[in-house]
Amino acid sequence: MKKLITPFLLVGALASCENATAPDLYTNYINDGEAHPLVILVGGSDGGNYFANPNMKPLMDRYHDYGFSVASMGYFDTSGTPDSPIELSLNEIDARIKAITEDSSIKGQCVALLGFSKGAELSLLLGSHFNTVNHIVAAYPSHVVWNAVKTPMSYSSWSIDGQPLPYIEAPLLSFDMLSGIFTGEYRNAFTDALSEASPKELNDAAIPVEKIKGSVTLVSARQDQIWPSFEMANKIEQRLSDNSYENPVLHIDLDGDHYSYNKETMDTVLTHLKRVMGSECN
């Protein structure tokens, strides 16, 4: 067991060292003296600010082609965010986003939050529980809250008003999680956790996406090897439909894996966002 755990801890330690040097917030705004709509990016389970890497600037510049300013933020393990990924305060993350939207160069009612993987879970939660952001894009999303990453202990990933959110647990030290270190396949750990959860546990952990105030865009992968994003995106769609959700909903299901989001996908997402935001944002 020790031989299996050690590489996992080493990977986590190396990721932490890299993230600690990343800024909490990176901005790439259109600098023409006018206010523009904004897309805020949040990354996956490393919690850092992946999009702040200078190598990502050409990609970030593409948002300008669609009239969007763009920012990216870390939510743990950067210099000014919590070190631990346990019970992260959604209130604090929302307050940080609100401060970003109050910049005079941003149209405050024209903000989209685009999260990837664990960041998609976060984005859906923020849209469901707060009114700061009115358009949510969730790439490789989850319909439920999961346990905290990077810890073998059982904790919720998120909290609101100091209270941890109910969650489904995919144990870090399960066979499927540990073998994934070598195979890159973690999907079974999550599908097993979902199938073994009781109806009450699933209901309690479900993200109340019907409370989102604006458009919902989902991007999933049919061959997702990390977790079942296609099936979970379908659950989100079904919940929205069951609650007679009236805002625009788009589900882009990719014929690929967890890393198949490419420039064409990005163009589709931004074209859709520009349309659903309406003339007041463009």
Which ranges hold each PLM region?
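Alpha/beta-hydrolase fold nucleophile elbow
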Residues: S105-S117
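Short, surface-exposed "cap/lid" segments of acyl-processing enzymes
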Residues: D32-R62
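Short beta-strand-to-loop junctions in surface cap/lid or active-site-entrance loops
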Residues: P23-A35, S104, V276
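Accessory cap/linker subdomain of secreted extracellular hydrolases
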Residues: S128, H135-K211, R222, I226
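Short glycine-enriched nucleophile-adjacent loop
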Residues: A120-N131
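Conserved alpha/beta-hydrolase
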Residues: H64-G80
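C-terminal catalytic histidine-bearing segment of alpha/beta-hydrolase fold enzymes
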Residues: G43, D83-P85, V219, E231-N282
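Alpha/beta-hydrolase active-site loop
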Residues: D83-S104
